[in-house]
Amino acid sequence: MVLMIVSGRSGSGKSVALRALEDMGFYCVDNLPVVLLPDLARTLADRQISAAVSIDVRNMPESPEIFEQAMNNLPGAFSPQLLFLDADRNTLIRRYSDTRRLHPLSSKNLSLESAIDKESDLLEPLRSRADLIVDTSEMSVHELAEMLRTRLLGKRERELTMVFESFGFKHGIPIDADYVFDVRFLPNPHWDPKLRPMTGLDKPVAAFLDRHTEVHNFIYQTRSYLELWLPMLETNNRSYLTVAIGCTGGKHRSVYIAEQLADYFRSRGKNVQSRHRTLEKRKT
């Protein structure tokens, strides 16, 4: 059974995550004090029910040792997993402005910006030991729920899920990436007026990139690197591996490369997902 601990900065989507986990059959508790985690787990152990608990800055233990002690006292039937949700500072500020809610630390006479920064410092002990960090900056409520369903169901099946995501460096590097590869040195379809409106998912762009030897070499060497270390990653109690491929805008080269790598590992029987951050952002 799984004990999913959901944490993250306020406004990053913890309530959405908890609702998604409840839909997946988890017994969910919002803002349970850390010291009560072992008691909850023992209560649910006999019923064979996986649980999800949210922890935010209001019920953080006074010291990391208290959290470690609670984890050590969990029944052996439970496998604890820590999910940490985050978003960039500007996104969190915008979400608070849209909802007009008060930040949990606002009562300490802090501005919203200062409260967000302070919260980040207080939650760092949890973030540093998270099994999965999810950046929700560009996600809608439905996208976050769907992403959690695909990733966490894979985790419960103890199967490594390889996630290949494209992005644009001008929009920032994904904070949930395990590996980041820069493909800005490859030939750029952007400079062809006919290809500029298209994306790396379109056949003319794929044909353009497929004509270049350096593109083939990059794909071959990247997949060879991943194949070399994949067996160790699979035996290291991991459930996911996020590989981010970045070009300038996240529209052509990174999309094509991410899809090529995803197709290759999918053909090898791996559990593979692909997503394209810039293209998804353009849809919203």
Swiss-Prot record:
The keyword Secreted does not apply. GTP binds at D56, V57, R58, N59. Pfam families: PapZ_C, RapZ-like_N. GO terms for molecular function: ATP binding; GTP binding; molecular adaptor activity; RNA binding. Residues 266-284 are annotated as: RNA-binding. ATP binds at G8, R9, S10, G11, S12, G13, K14, S15. Keywords: ATP-binding, GTP-binding, Nucleotide-binding, RNA-binding. Homotrimer. Modulates the synthesis of GlmS, by affecting the processing and stability of the regulatory small RNA GlmZ. When glucosamine-6-phosphate (GlcN6P) concentrations are high in the cell, RapZ binds GlmZ and targets it to cleavage by RNase E. Consequently, GlmZ is inactivated and unable to activate GlmS synthesis. Under low GlcN6P concentrations, RapZ is sequestered and inactivated by an other regulatory small RNA, GlmY, preventing GlmZ degradation and leading to synthesis of GlmS. Belongs to the RapZ-like family. RapZ subfamily. This is RNase adapter protein RapZ. It comes from Salmonella typhimurium (strain LT2 / SGSC1412 / ATCC 700720).
